């Protein structure tokens, strides 16, 4: 009888060890939030009021392709974004081109303002802040700081 209890206690020890090893591998809602898929699901399921509550407090540190995805969410859910009343204006807006073109139709030369739209500007100063310098750090950025880099959003002043 004593021998049977000792054998059973050995199997209980083994079961306990296996359980301690396996339990951390089972995804929980809290653990899922720390994976990329979990964050995507969290961002997708948030309501407008949820976004307003976390906009200035929640920080995320993102680099490279994860930074691009984070910027997508910040631009998409920007709580200060102004909605457009009329169609989106782009650099090739016909009215703007007609106003700035002084050459007759069919000219081989572009007006200087129109030609400059095709040039990319480069930062000359290496110390100029960038989204990577700001948000690819241990502290990360708030949603508000990410949204400041949204390329096409018109935003309300909130300060």
Curated annotation (Swiss-Prot):
Possible ligand of InR/insulin-like receptor. GO terms for biological process: insulin receptor signaling pathway. Gene3D superfamilies: Insulin-like (1.10.100.10). The keyword Disulfide bond applies. InterPro entries: Insulin-like_sf. Broadly expressed at a low level throughout the embryo, except the yolk. Expressed at a moderate level in the embryonic midgut. Larval expression is restricted to ten cells of the ventral nerve cord - in four pairs of centrally located cells in the most posterior abdominal segments and in one pair of dorsally located cells in the A1 or A2 segments. GO terms for cellular component: extracellular region; extracellular space. Keywords: Cleavage on pair of basic residues, Disulfide bond, Secreted, Signal. It is found in: Secreted. CDD domains: IlGF_relaxin_like. This is Insulin-like peptide 7. Belongs to the insulin family. It comes from the Eukaryota. Residues 90-121 form a propeptide. Heterodimer of a B chain and an A chain linked by two disulfide bonds. Disulfide bonds join 63-136, 75-150, 135-141. GO terms for molecular function: insulin receptor binding. Its main location: secreted. Residues 1-31 form the signal peptide.
């Amino acid at each position: 009888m004593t021998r049977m209890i000792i054998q059973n206690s050995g199997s209980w020890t083994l079961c306990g060890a296996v359980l301690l090893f396996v339990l951390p591998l089972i995804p929980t809602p809290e653990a899922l939030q720390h994976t990329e898929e979990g964050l995507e699901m969290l961002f997708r399921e948030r309501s407008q009021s949820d976004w307003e509550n976390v906009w200035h407090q929640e920080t995320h540190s993102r680099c490279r392709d994860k930074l691009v995805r984070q910027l997508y969410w910040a631009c998409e859910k920007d709580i200060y974004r102004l909605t457009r009343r009329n169609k989106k204006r782009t650099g090739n807006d016909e009215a703007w081109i007609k106003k700035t073109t002084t050459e007759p139709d069919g000219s081989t030369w572009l007006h200087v303002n129109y030609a400059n739209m095709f040039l990319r500007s480069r930062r000359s100063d290496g110390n100029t802040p960038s989204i990577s310098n700001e948000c690819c750090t241990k502290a990360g950025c708030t949603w508000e700081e990410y949204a400041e880099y949204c390329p096409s959003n018109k935003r309300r002043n909130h300060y």
